Amino acid sequence: MKKHFVLLFFLLLVAVAEAANPVKQMLERLQEGLSDRFKIEIRSSSDEGDYFELYGGGRKVTVRANNYVSAAFGINWYLKYYCHAHVSFCGDQLPQLPVDLPQVKERHATKLSDNFYMNYCTFSYTTAFWNWKRWEREIDLMALSGINMPMAMVGVEAVWRNTLLKFGYTLPEVKEFLCGPAYFGWLLMGNLENIGGPLPDEWFKEQIVLQKKILARMREYGMKPVFQGFFGMVP
């Protein structure tokens, strides 16, 4: 009876760990059942560098890496170079994988610890009106591309608004200062103010909720979000 209880407890722990694995969840978003084709092992590296190893084949390929982002990057490597699949920011070509996966034995490592992504202009040109579904997709693609230090600028305008109000600015003055979403990049670089505004109150609430989801997912992967600091500009 005791042995059965220990076994049941162990299986429960495994199930919980699988459910909490962001790479497994990402693979299911890419294609139903895809997570079953990869075994993911997270192990630290003695030389303190990022790495991934691929080995096995047939029913399942094992991916060993020092973190979730490295594991996701390794899976993307395998899909691209062994399964001739393509998952990218511009679209996917991801057919059903063969019953017998191609055999593989590879190891790749890097001494580069910070892989930064995005800039202010890209943020405003591209992401200004994204919802959670689109951001979820983008964060998955970041992981598949090995990115571990993404910009996290969503909702910065809410921080500006709250801070200025606490410093005694009136709400009309704050609204006059902040620009519209398509111009946030230039506001955050200190280049302009007011253009495209004012923003409705509901916008700030929605962006705060969205940013919390974005940060939670980035941190699940082990990414280090980059936030906006104060650069000396005031109304």
Where are the regions that the model predicts?
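Short, intrinsically disordered, charge-balanced linker/junction segments flanking boundaries
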Residues: 16-19, 235
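Short secondary-structure capping/junction motifs at helix and strand boundaries
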Residues: 2-4, 85-89, 147-152
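Alpha-helical transmembrane segments and their juxtamembrane interfaces
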Residues: 12-13, 77, 230
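Contiguous, structured surface segment used for ligand recognition
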Residues: 19-112
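Sec-dependent N-terminal signal peptides
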Residues: 4-14
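Active-site-proximal flexible loops/turns
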Residues: 9, 74, 235
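Aromatic-lined carbohydrate-binding surfaces of glycoside hydrolases
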Residues: 42-45, 57-64, 68, 93-94, ...
